């Protein structure tokens, strides 16, 4: 009851609201009230706490699970949204997110490379690296491009080598860039 009163009093203060929700979580966890525990886990997820996803999912009845997950995907903050996509292996939504924002490839590429979207994901990653390289104009930006290339090589070593060669040919006069490529093993 105290935690509910605290939530009501602090609705305008998100940080305190979450603290009260966590108090309720611990109370319901100890008393074994599964339905209330599921509700508070969902509230915490909507508040941006991805750590409660697996427990929330385990508390949802099987017949409602897919509907509730889809509903949560529509309302979830980005941290929770990403957690759900990875946990549920929703490669369709991962690919969509990468089309909108190629930087999401750093998070989703390893899942996408083993999916029907593998070829498109590889193209997007290569284009993203090339585009970033085109805009780079100092050593720290070259180093950032090379780190992206190194991350790409962990999942696609052959494509990364080809791309590194393409970058060498495209920017032969940018000595600092070539040095940064060597530093990361290209």
Briefly describe each language-model feature range.
Residues 1-186:
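Eukaryote-biased, non-catalytic alpha-solenoid scaffold regions
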């Amino acid at each position: 009851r105290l935690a509910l009163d605290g939530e009501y009093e602090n609705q305008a203060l998100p940080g305190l609201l979450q603290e009260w929700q966590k108090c309720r979580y611990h109370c319901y966890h100890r008393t074994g009230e599964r339905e209330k525990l599921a509700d508070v886990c969902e509230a915490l997820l909507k508040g941006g706490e991805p750590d409660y996803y697996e427990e929330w999912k385990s508390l949802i009845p099987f017949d409602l699970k897919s509907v509730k997950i889809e509903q949560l995907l529509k309302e979830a903050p980005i941290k929770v949204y990403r957690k759900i996509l990875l946990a549920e292996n929703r490669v369709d939504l991962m690919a969509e997110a990468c089309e909108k924002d190629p930087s999401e490839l750093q998070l989703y590429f390893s899942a996408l490379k083993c999916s029907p979207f593998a070829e498109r994901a590889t193209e997007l990653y290569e284009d993203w690296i090339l585009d970033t390289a085109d805009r780079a104009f100092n050593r720290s930006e070259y180093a950032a491009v090379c780190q992206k290339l190194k991350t790409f090589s962990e999942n696609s070593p052959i494509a990364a080598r080809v791309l590194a060669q393409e970058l060498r040919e495209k920017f032969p006069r940018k000595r600092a860039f070539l040095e940064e490529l060597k530093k990361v093993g290209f």
